[in-house]
């Protein structure tokens, strides 16, 4: 795949290029590229107009992070998250229970979070922490869904223990072969508001 005359490959596998700037290339690693939990070093080749740059990159099993409302992966800001209990997605503030349009029943609120770095990861190894409350197991309502290259969503249910928590950091954790990978620390994480 080529963008603006630039190609990029990891271990001979073409990468999807999202943007190319003067000093930065945003790319999506090839799906199913293998890695040990401590990371695997692969050769990376970047070409532009006949010039070739060869170096190395370390690939880890997962590198989860949460998109902010501007759809960038950066510290702080508001999380890109919606109430997906009903067909029409709604934004924060969130409540812990929502009335379903079909059936008019009060149910646990289902939130959809926009993420990156979790492709090929099952819901069984994912947990989401809001403030001090951890959501995992049956609280994770879906496996990750690919929305765009490098962008996935995952749905989860808000537990009653989050009622009235207010503005809280949201952290994504993935455990691969006994090793834990977290999106960010609390002080740099994106946030959401729960009434």
Could you describe each region identified by the protein language model?
Residues 1-195:
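A sequence-level detector for low-complexity, Ser/Thr- and acidic-rich stretches
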């Amino acid at each position: 795949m080529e963008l603006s005359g630039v190609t990029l490959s990891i271990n001979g596998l073409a990468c999807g290029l999202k943007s190319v700037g003067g000093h930065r290339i945003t790319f999506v690693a090839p799906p199913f590229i293998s890695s040990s939990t401590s990371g695997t070093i692969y050769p990376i080749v970047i070409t532009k107009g006949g010039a070739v740059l060869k170096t190395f990159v370390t690939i880890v099993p997962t590198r989860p992070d949460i998109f902010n409302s501007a759809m960038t992966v950066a510290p702080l800001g508001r999380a890109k998250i919606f109430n997906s209990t009903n067909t029409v997605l709604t934004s924060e503030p969130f409540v812990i229970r929502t009335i379903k349009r079909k059936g008019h029943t009060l149910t646990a609120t289902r939130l959809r979070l926009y993420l990156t770095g979790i492709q090929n990861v099952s819901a069984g190894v994912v947990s989401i922490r809001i403030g001090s409350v951890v959501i995992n197991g049956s609280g994770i309502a879906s496996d990750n869904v690919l929305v765009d290259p490098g962008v996935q969503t995952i749905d989860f249910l808000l537990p009653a223990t989050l009622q009235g928590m207010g503005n809280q950091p949201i952290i994504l954790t993935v455990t691969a072969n006994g090793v834990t990978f977290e999106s960010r620390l609390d002080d740099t994480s994106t946030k959401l508001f729960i009434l």
